[in-house]
């Protein structure tokens, strides 16, 4: 912490939903202006911000940069759409490509970048699923489910550097609505509240 340096990256006052690339070279953020939102990217070594996706009638709900920093993955609500969709966008600008629908958290990548994990809320019965899909959005599958008294929150999960576990926030209605972190074994789908053996 002695060598930590804090720098202001934007000064407009309308930036939200930011993410940094795994190699620390890029920062992506959302700008909201006039009821529309756009996606911007910046090289940390420079002071210039580049518009990656122009303003549109969307609400970005989470942004993540891929492991190799070539793509930005952003979940977004279009207009009055009830469910968020996941888009893959070339990091330095290009046309967004919809790769998934019905996603309720930012994604988190596996260490090799071949897959990502995300949360999908379930309305009835109340709950949420922790989902895994390939980097192109194909092959989605349920890694773990939560229903009833302990439910995954719509927050970004975190894939462990060794690839064996995923951590996800959850709320426990058995413990007066307290929240915590649960780990999920990628191979078996077994869940365990963090700190318990």
Predicted features along the sequence, with ranges:
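Acidic, proline/glycine-rich low-complexity intrinsically disordered segments
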Residues: 1-197
